[in-house]
Amino acid sequence: MITVHFVHGARSYLPELAAYQAHIERLGHAVQMHTQAHTVPDDAQAVWWICGRVPAAQARRLQGAVQVHEYTSASVAPLAWLKDRIKQWQHPVPDFRVFQSEWVRQRMGFEGDAVPYALRDMGVPESFLTAQALQPPEFDLVYLGEMRRLLHFVPLLQTLGQAGLKLLLVGDVPPDLKAHLAALGHIQSTGRLPHDQVPAQLLRARAGLNLMPDVLPLSEQTSTKLLEYLALGLPVVSNPYAWAKRTAQAHAGRVQLLGLQASAAHWQAAMQALPLRQTDRQHLASLGWSHQLQALPVWDALFGAGR
């Protein structure tokens, strides 16, 4: 049995870590999580860095281990390009790399070397694919995810109220956003919830709301919440940006794109045109974490071809 030591930032929300742990344990191996590299034992056999910065001294200390570098996203502004180049130049060379997408791989600039790699998109827990609503929806829309991001969309939130639409926020609302929401009686929030309670909260609404600033790298990266809405059978309303447009094409009729300047009347019409919630989602099995992880070649690198 091999223990895989994951090193990640304590402040990051990384649902993939739970999926990795479950998959690795199903393969008969073990997992330990670390927020500081120095807590990884010297005799570790496998170290999986969620990048972030990989300290060269720690990588040398652990040179007896198979080392994986995972890039879940490219760097964000300010100085995003420079941050990515610093990672490219300063990171030690690993045994394997994992990228969320081909776009992230190219953005990080590693395409010229010989290190083997895999692309691993975001997934959803299998429980999302089977959860069912137990009562009619109480809200028109539900939003899950990074709440601070909603500060970019306060005018849109006001438009939802003008359209007579009720919005549920699933998660912890920061104080600066609360100040904006105080005058908006059409919005309620749940506060922070354990992830296993999220499906029931999302199913309280008719549709999922996906809002993302149309700036790199956010506009090219997977919106996990949009995948979770789809996995629960909810139709989705999203602002248009590159990744959302591709996803709307891949899930024809399930994702409606609506511009940020859309009027209250446009929102009312969009909501009336939404399809019904899907109760049978077997065709969406590929969104599940088990499907995303099972074929990754990184397992052979860590555990050998026999696993």
Task: Enumerate the language-model features and the residues they cover.
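Membrane-proximal helix-turn-helix segments that form the acceptor-binding/catalytic region
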Residues: 74, 78-99
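A short alpha->beta transition loop at the rim of the catalytic pocket in nucleotide-sugar-dependent
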Residues: 206, 233
